[in-house]
Amino acid sequence: MSSMQLRTFTFAVSMILAGAAVAQEAEGRTRFILAASWQPAFCQTNQKKPECASQTGERHDATNFSLHGLWPMRQDYCGVSDDQKAADKDGKWDTLPDVALSAETKASLAKAMPGTQSGLERHEWIKHGTCTKMSVEDYFGVGVHLVDALNTSAVRDLFAANIGKTVKAEAIKAAFDKSFGPGAGERVKMSCRRAGSVRVISELTIGLSADAGAASAKSASLADLIRGGGKTSFGCDEGVVDAAGF
């Protein structure tokens, strides 16, 4: 290969790589995950947990998504002691430091995250929140705001209208696109689990942009944050929307 051919080849490769980088940037990149649980399904296999033993058909989490967590990608336990990390991994959440929140945020979190009855907020902060640049107040404030936005969308309406019935991936993607813009459904992954002989939908994980990691996200548009995330495979293709109760 002559020097001229080599330069031409090198230039062509660089342009291809640059084009790929631009395309990736245009598609967005997931920096945070919003994990939203369908609590009745979670409780089918965790019936002894306080939040499950106390669940009723009238409670908020029976017909709305619950906040599992807000997770920075590929980071966990930032600046956490080995003892606290070990306690967290052993499920000894009651031994972890209390999460100091304002009365308003604490009340909002108790509604959005029924797992607070088992110390879930302590686990989420130790494992995930410590890897954000937010205060504990802002971290949970953002999480509550985002799951509230999900619960005022066509996605929640779809689930609430189909309790006890099977919902397919295509319908869920369409609901995301309806509420959060074209392509939003391509940034969602669905998880299912077995409850006896029935496959129930247990959780949705939603890809978000880096802007989800700022205190300003407490007033951000969930549609904008999803739009800035990267595409993913949907996972479970269908499942039953479980009703409260065992």
PLM features: what roles do these ranges have?
Residues Q24-E51:
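N-terminal module-boundary/linker segments of secreted carbohydrate-active enzymes
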Residues T10-A12, G235:
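Compositionally biased, low-structure terminal segments
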Residues M1-T10:
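Bacterial N-terminal signal peptides that target proteins for export
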Residues A18-A20:
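N-terminal signal peptide c-region/cleavage motif recognized by signal peptidases
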Residues K48-F246:
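Domain-level detector of nuclease and nuclease-like folds
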